[in-house]
Amino acid sequence: NPNLLPEEQTPVIDLAKTLSPTQKKSLEENLNNLEMQSGWKIKYLSQFESVPGIAIKNYWDLDETSLLVIADPRGGNLLNFNVGDAYFSFLPRLFWVELQTRYGNQYYVREHGEDGAVLDAINSVKICLEKGGCQVVPGLPKEQYLWTLSTSILGGLIAGFSAAPR
């Protein structure tokens, strides 16, 4: 339904009212500044019952430098991403899976709210773009990273020894 799109250009269309007016204004300013300074376009759409559909692509002129962040509470995961091809040079496909599962899952949303999940996910992308790319989503505590690394190595050793011929 293209009638849902605002007359004026804005990088934030919050149909589901996920963000407070202050958060929305701040996000609009941040995303506009990011686009002016770097050329990367991040757009945010929250939807609930009515959706603008394919009209959103023309409204925002989405291209290979565009990231569309969609928040839709109707599914199992709050967040979905429509990622322009240029992003994959800096942020691999697994980054987007991790981003969605970390911030869009029901437990994170329950603890931080829909607004927190959306803003944290967008902030993670911005941090990675400013750093020139990321292989994983930033913010994993060092202890958790080391624990995961050590258990993976230990599991590999156990599997290797048990598979070795005797």
Residue ranges and their predicted role:
Residues 1-149:
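Folded, non-transmembrane soluble domains that reside on the lumenal/extracytoplasmic side of membranes
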Residues 138-166:
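C-terminal single-pass membrane-anchor helix
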